[in-house]
């Protein structure tokens, strides 16, 4: 159970672009957790576990394989086969990217966020994949190409399931600062394309068979029953992204998992993160 999260010192802190020789560009979140069972065993004494989440820039020498694994988790086993994950990991490592680690900069990231410039990479395998997903994306990309003064970022982000959502606001703020530095003159992207996933809470599969139905034909015995009464989010921030999305659509559920695609403008992205941060403060 998360008891305390120290984020105040992160809100206005900017990560340095170049690490100092004897330092790093890391920011820390100190999370204290308790185990209620241990509390009872220790007569009410809390056992406190402190975890420091350190924020780093993408490191091609260390992060490549871990990013591929996180991308495979993001897209799922089926969609991952349609994407050149190695090429996409290279794009991420060549773009404004923030990773979160717990064992120093040489360790594997538990989380990442990246903003890949669309126009600079519009011929990439990943863009070609997105164009085939839905006509709305293909049309939007054409509009961006034809527009001389508008641009968008391909937002890619994933984290291990036990990463707390409290890391998300500083993660976005730090990376958006890096985007402004990369674009120059404190600029930002006009639009952001976010790919994420949701899941069916009550997804279930049952064989329509029992001992009294064994004489029915094989087709009837092999039928599956799917219940999808409720859909929920893997990532808490996606609730807010959907709220402010200019375009939002989803794929059909596959084994209880739904791919979700959103296009937000800059104002919508910032509002989403601000509202998420406000929501977290009430927990």
UniProtKB/Swiss-Prot annotation:
GO biological process: protein export from nucleus; ribosomal large subunit export from nucleus
PTM section of the record: Phosphorylated by the PHO85-PCL1 kinase complex.
Ranges of biased composition (kind: Acidic residues): 20-29
Locations listed in the record: Cytoplasm; Nucleus
Region (Disordered): 12-44
SS bond list: none
Main location: cytoplasm
Any single GO CC term annotated in Swiss-Prot or TrEMBL for this entry: cytoplasm
Alphabetical keyword list: Cytoplasm, Nucleus, Phosphoprotein, Protein transport, Transport
PTM sites of type Phosphothreonine: 205, 209
Keyword Cell membrane annotated: no
GO MF terms, alphabetically ordered: protein folding chaperone
Classification via InterPro entries: BCP1_family
PANTHER family linked: BRCA2 AND CDKN1A INTERACTING PROTEIN (PTHR13261), BRCA2 AND CDKN1A-INTERACTING PROTEIN (PTHR13261:SF0)
Protein family according to the UniProt entry: Belongs to the BCP1 family.
Additional free-text comment from the UniProt record: Present with 4590 molecules/cell in log phase SD medium.
Protein name: Protein BCP1
Organism: Saccharomyces cerevisiae (strain ATCC 204508 / S288c) (Baker's yeast)
Lineage: Eukaryota, Fungi, Dikarya, Ascomycota, Saccharomycotina
